[in-house]
UniProtKB/Swiss-Prot annotation:
This is Formin-like protein 9. The gene is FH9. Residues 1-19 form the signal peptide. It comes from the Eukaryota. GO terms for cellular component: cytoskeleton; membrane.
């Protein structure tokens, strides 16, 4: 009986005792209360005859003696008061004469009885002043008892649950050792003989047959008998034969493996080792010891051996006889499916034997056994894949138990083997060297997936002389798939259609991979990176290195050009100006006294440039000189476009006619409002014409204005041709003809105002900044020529070159500033011409050109729609244009 069940029985036996103890304590309390006052005959006296149910009711406070109600009053009244009975050991006092009360028949009594009601046995009326025993005390006693019972039940449940968990852990721990009885196991586990015929033991032909039947044996889960002959380090052999299953109907037995000694005896035969079943207690004790000496039963790295077996596994022994109890857990199948430890070789001496009861083997020749020895290294333990356990377990353990109940017999057996080996019995041949790489087919089987396909052979292109072509730099393009159902230009091109042949030597020299050169460059860069000292900040140093590569000139050429003041292009000067260091970096480079080769090439280049007086200011004025003419030409062209746009807007009659049509149409639309009767409007109202739509949802007010202008132009053109007066009551067909004739005239407005569109893209602030930059550059050039370099005679060439340019730049800047003032004046006059006032913000002086440009875009769109539409909706003329 388990410990949990014992605890439960003890708690259940203690609980009634506690309840009875509470009842006895209550009885004693009642007895003490009854000694002071005898209850009347109707009351219940505390005696030994008090029933169990009455005690329980008194404990719970359910047995109260209360007086009855008024309606039962006459039945509860006694004819005469009677004293309470006195115990026999006390002397009786004379009772007073009873007063006889004669109740009236049929009439209820109107007076209440003055006789005290019968008291409960727990009341005391003597001088001691004892009161009723508190009900809370009684309830507390009951609650305490119930709590003890509940506590006992909870402890029992917790113990049962803990015992179940412990059983589960033990079951998992002994799962490799204990498989249950024959009735509880599956048929596949109890079946001793495999459905597949096993090969004859210790023959080479059987090994070949086993290798052929290996895939079938892998899928079969019923074959449980195996014989493993492995090579122990230093020439030791281990042969594990089929295991015998001992069934016991009364208790679970342990499956044990029996081994057969396979040493080379002088008798030339292998004797049968009788099966000895070890005691169940011994197995359990060893299993418990095994669990105590290891942290986890699922650990795949432990290995338990008996002392005798361990002592016999010495390098001097040539054979190993498994005659003592051995519990072995192999390291071959860890949780991580290590391919090297789990790989199987079909030629590793595996034998399948079908044994029922006792085992009989014939002795195999020494030569055959030497061939069948394991070929894997001693550090690896390899097992066939058909006997692998389920990989879903946390760690796979293979236990070989070789049972023998007596340790003395194992020692005798070992001594007998030692004597036989010392008598000169020939030793078996040494095993062959271990196999480095397992076969690929078994490697794929071990991982549970097919082996990967072999890599495709690389196609080596061969030239005309038969030598392999070297690899060149690739040309990255996108291949086009050939379309068999479509004719393409590539179908007419053949590889042999070229009239010329490649110059292989030239293409190799130009585009071949220079692996050695690149490696040398990398090594040189690494060496310089480890030995150089950086003065310039890292990010700026990288930019300087990139700019240095774009110069396409050496240091001496750059220095000579800077000294002379010419000879460098705009791109080179821009790169040199960007290399300008900060003041701190300039001081560090000038004060650097170490080895110049220790500096970075870019830093070394900048250091050489700093040796020239005013090197970077020279570069800046040289760049200013090269860009001066281009900047001035761009500014003058912008000024010319602005002047042309002002002239076009003032002189365009078509634009004036359009403004007239919009003014008349707007006044008609604003009749009856404050906006009506206008004589002028701002040009931004032209953009609002496209927002007002007609009832059809398509025609806008701009459509209407353009059609009327086109009709008016067409009518005038027709009058000039026919010299007939026009009529105000023209038919709709005639109006359509006039409109189609005048649409071309209206669309010409966009061509007349061509400069207006260009000026709209000009930013006046940008023009002003350009002129300001030119003025600042001119001032810097003047300071450099007149002050900084005037005292040095070595700079004569540079000064002469810059002085001539200085005079030209000063005259040009004076004319440019005059043009700027004139252009701004013309823009102000144009703004006043259309708007009547000039905005205070001078940055919006060109806003009028932007408005006209947007309106011309809307006008061109309407004209295209009118040309494309043949059947336009007829519009009635509201205001004829005169």
């Amino acid at each position: 009986m388990g410990m949990a069940m014992r605890c439960v029985l003890v708690l259940f036996s203690v609980s009634p005792v506690l309840l009875l103890f509470n009842f006895e304590m209550l009885e004693v309390a009642l007895h003490l209360a009854s000694r002071e006052k005898e209850l009347d005959t109707a009351a219940v006296t505390p005696s030994a005859s008090l029933s169990f149910l009455s005690r329980f009711r008194i404990m719970l406070g359910m047995n109260h003696h209360r007086s009855r109600g008024r309606r039962h009053k006459r039945y509860s009244e006694a004819p005469a008061p009677a004293p309470a009975p006195v115990p026999a050991h006390q002397a009786r006092s004379e009772a007073p004469a009873p007063l006889v009360h004669v109740p009236r028949k049929g009439m209820p009594s109107t007076h209440r009885s003055h006789i005290a009601p019968a008291r409960s046995p727990v009341h005391k009326v003597k001088d001691g002043g004892h009161t009723k025993i508190p009900r809370s005390a009684i309830v507390a006693l009951g609650v305490v008892g119930l709590c003890l019972v509940v506590l006992g039940v909870v402890i029992a449940a917790f113990s049962v649950r803990r015992s179940r968990k412990f059983k589960k852990v033990c079951t998992k721990a002994f799962k490799p050792f204990r498989h249950g009885s024959r009735d509880q196991r599956s048929p596949a586990a109890t079946r001793k003989v495999s459905s597949h015929p096993s090969p004859d033991p210790l023959t080479l032909s059987s090994i070949v047959q086993y290798q052929q039947n290996l895939p079938n044996l892998k899928q079969s889960s019923e074959s449980k008998s195996l014989s493993i002959q492995s090579t122990i380090p230093m020439g030791t052999e281990l042969i594990v034969s089929d295991h015998a299953v001992i069934n016991n109907s009364q208790s679970d037995e342990v499956e044990s493996f029996h081994s057969i000694p396979c040493s080379d005896l002088s008798a030339g035969s292998i004797t049968e080792l009788p099966q000895q079943i070890c005691d169940r207690r011994a197995i359990m004790n060893r299993s418990e010891y095994f669990l105590q000496t290891h942290d986890s039963p699922s650990d795949s790295s432990y290995q338990s051996l008996s002392p005798d077996c361990t002592s016999r596994l010495s390098p001097k022994d040539q054979t190993f006889t498994a005659s003592s109890h051995l519990s072995l857990r192999s390291k071959t199948c860890p949780e991580k499916s290590d391919g090297e430890n789990a790989e199987i070789n079909c030629h590793d001496g595996l034998e399948i034997t079908c044994i029922s009861g006792s085992m009989e083997h014939q002795e195999a020749p020494i030569e055959e056994r030497a061939r069948i020895n394991f070929r894997n290294p001693p550090s690896q333990h390899i097992f066939p894949p058909s006997y692998r356990t389920d990989t879903s377990q946390s760690k796979i353990n293979i236990a070989f138990t070789m049972t023998n109940s007596k340790v003395e017999s194992s020692s005798k057996e070992s001594s007998r083997i030692e004597t036989s080996s010392s008598m000169g019995i020939p030793k078996p041949a040494p095993p062959p060297p271990p196999q480095k790489n397992p076969p690929p087919n078994l490697k794929g089987q071990c991982y549970g997936q097919p082996p990967p396909p072999p890599p495709l052979p690389l196609q080596i292109q061969v030239g005309k002389d038969g030598s392999p072509l070297p690899r060149l730099k690739p040309l990255h393009w996108d291949k086009v798939r050939a379309a068999p159902n479509r004719s393409m230009v590539w179908n007419d091109i053949r590889s042999s259609s070229f009239e010329f042949e490649f110059d292989e030597q030239m293409i190799k020299s130009l585009f071949a991979y220079n692996l050695q050169g690149s490696m040398k460059d990398e090594e040189a860069m690494n060496k310089t990176a480890s030995t150089t000292k950086h003065v310039i900040e890292h990010h700026r140093l990288q930019n300087t290195t990139i700019l240095l590569k774009t110069l396409n000139a050496n240091t001496s050429q750059v220095c000579n050009s800077v000294i002379q003041g010419n000879g460098l292009s705009v791109q080179q000067l821009e790169a040199l100006v960007k290399m300008k260091p900060t003041k701190e970096e300039e001081e560090k480079l000038l004060n650097y006294d170490g080895d110049i080769n220790m500096l970075d090439p870019a830093e070394n280049f900048v250091k050489v440039l700093l040796t020239i007086p005013m090197a970077f200011p020279r570069m800046e004025v040289m760049l200013y000189k090269e860009n001066f003419d281009d900047e001035v030409a761009h500014i003058k062209m912008s000024f010319a476009m602005i002047e042309g746009a002002c002239t076009e807007l003032k002189s365009s009659k078509l634009f004036l006619r359009l403004l007239e049509a919009v003014l008349k149409t707007g006044n008609r639309m604003n009749v009856g409002t404050l906006r009506g009767g206008a004589s002028a409007f701002k040009l931004d109202a032209l953009l609002k014409l496209a927002d007002i739509r007609g009832t059809d949802g398509k025609t806008t007010l701009l459509h209407f204005v353009v059609k009327e202008m086109a009709r008016s132009k067409g009518l005038k053109a027709l009058e000039k041709l026919n010299e007939t007066p026009s009529s105000c009551h023209d038919t709709p067909t005639e109006r359509e003809e006039y409109s189609s004739m005048g649409t071309e005239f209206v669309s010409e407005l966009s061509n007349e105002l061509g400069n207006v569109k260009k000026v709209a893209s000009i930013d006046l602030d940008t023009l002003r900044n350009s002129i300001s930059n030119l003025s600042c550059g001119l001032a810097q050039l003047r300071n450099l020529v007149e002050k900084d370099l005037a005292s040095d005679d070595k700079n004569n060439n540079f000064l002469q070159c810059m002085k001539s340019f200085l005079n030209h730049a000063e005259n040009t800047m004076q004319g440019l500033k005059a043009d700027e003032a004139q252009v701004l004046l013309n823009v102000r006059e144009l703004t006043e011409y259309y708007h009547g006032e000039v905005s205070k913000d001078e940055s919006n002086l060109l806003q009028i050109f932007i408005i006209v440009k947007d309106f011309l875009g809307l006008l061109d769109k309407v004209c295209r729609e009118m040309r494309g539409t043949k059947h336009n909706q007829t519009l009635n003329l509201v205001l004829p244009l005169k």
